[in-house]
Amino acid sequence: MKLLPREKDKLLLFTAALLAEKRRNRGLKLNYPEAIALISAVILEGAREGKSVAELMDVGKNVLTRDDVMIGVPEMITNVQVEATFSDGTKLVTVHDPII
């Protein structure tokens, strides 16, 4: 299977997000890369499902709470930017302060 670099990046992101989700379900607190991966994957999947940029900006704020991540992670993640493919093209989705 031949993948473009962008496709490889998405595959790596989803692999990290699956691992993060499993760890969260086991009660482990997520670190910085795991939190970014999980939020990003939710945004990408939402775009695939047909949600709008505005909807995904709201969804991105409800993926994780402070209780889900290690100490200091919410302060490290001031925003998450994901380039997602929508039915009408590729758009940048920015979620400000995603971990409440």
Curated annotation (Swiss-Prot):
Disulfide bonds: none annotated. GO terms for molecular function: nickel cation binding; urease activity. Transmembrane segments: none annotated. It is an enzyme of class 3 (hydrolase). Pfam families: Urease_gamma. It is found in: Cytoplasm. Its main location: cytoplasm. Heterotrimer of UreA (gamma), UreB (beta) and UreC (alpha) subunits. Three heterotrimers associate to form the active enzyme. Belongs to the urease gamma subunit family. PANTHER family: UREASE. This is Urease subunit gamma. It comes from Blochmanniella pennsylvanica (strain BPEN).
